[in-house]
Amino acid sequence: ASATAIYGSRASNGVVLITTKRGEEGKAKIQYEGYVGWQAMPKYLDVMNLPQYAEFYNVRAKIQGWGEREDYKDPYLLTNGTDWQRELFQTAFMQNHNVNISGGNKDMHYSLSGGYLDQDGVGIGSGFTRASFRANFDTNVTNWLQVGVNTAYSNTKQNITFTENNVINTALNQFPDVAPRNPDGSYGVPQTNDFATYYSNPIFEANMKENRTNNYQLDYNVFANIKPVKGLNIRIEYGGNRGWYNTYYFVPDYSYGDIKVESQSTRGKNLSKYNSFKQYATYDFDPFKNNHFQIMLGHEAQWGNWESLSGSRKGYLSDAIHSLNAGDSKTATNSNDDGTPWSIESYFGRFNYNLLDRYLLTATLRTDGSS
């Protein structure tokens, strides 16, 4: 409890401390880590094939008084039909590569690293890629002043085939007598259905709908360590991050049974801003033999904001063009949110007493004020 108290009320669920990889004194080191592999579904759920479904249909049709379907008179002359799970899921390739270059001398250390992850989704049409870069640098300007900078940048892209499990549910519920594609290449959908239940083609859902994100993240931190006198260390930090989040969604015109869906495109852009300015001083001293004291006092200011903008249009003449400008301007809807700026200012302190390297006493204080 004492260890987390220094971080205030927001540490009620615990604190995760992240340390960055730094260069070591000596010659430059080049390190590479990577792998390639494949992913696949470990198991498929048991569902009815076409002969089993036809037999079930005939029993229910007899009870409901529908009459048998001509093509279901002898179910076991039928093929197995469509196994939608095996149509929807695939063996997916993935690769991950990371390179790090680090080094330094007694007064300077550096570390540069880059990574790339490319992961095809087990579900067709889905996937994830991430490119990242990180740089850490610190130097001793004098024997009492050290400065440094840490930066990290990443770009992630994701194709989202499965939203709220709709495609998976459709694959489990869709009838095995529906073909994934018709002979002319179009997607198969049920046009007549005595159950009065219609499911879209999950292969169509995965391939034709656009649902993707493209996000950028930048984190930065600059710091200075000042040692004006023996035992006293003053650290000043300024840092923050910027996040750019872009969403793209498009649904083409399609219909099945009595259901008709109009084409629609939606675009969204979001920006997050976070800043932090922290200063704290730590003083270590030994007033008596086997007695060690440490006193730390600090101040931190944090502030940020969130902005968002989105737009949508319907009535596209072509499914090949997803730009908002290509939609019917009469159906345009827009929304924006400049967000609510927020800020937190904090003062904190900690006292540590060590007797004989055996008995420890710690006291922590912190106060926060927020906008």
Task: Give the predicted meaning of each segment.
Residues V16, V99, F133-A135, Y220-V222, ...:
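Membrane-embedded beta-strands of outer-membrane beta-barrel proteins
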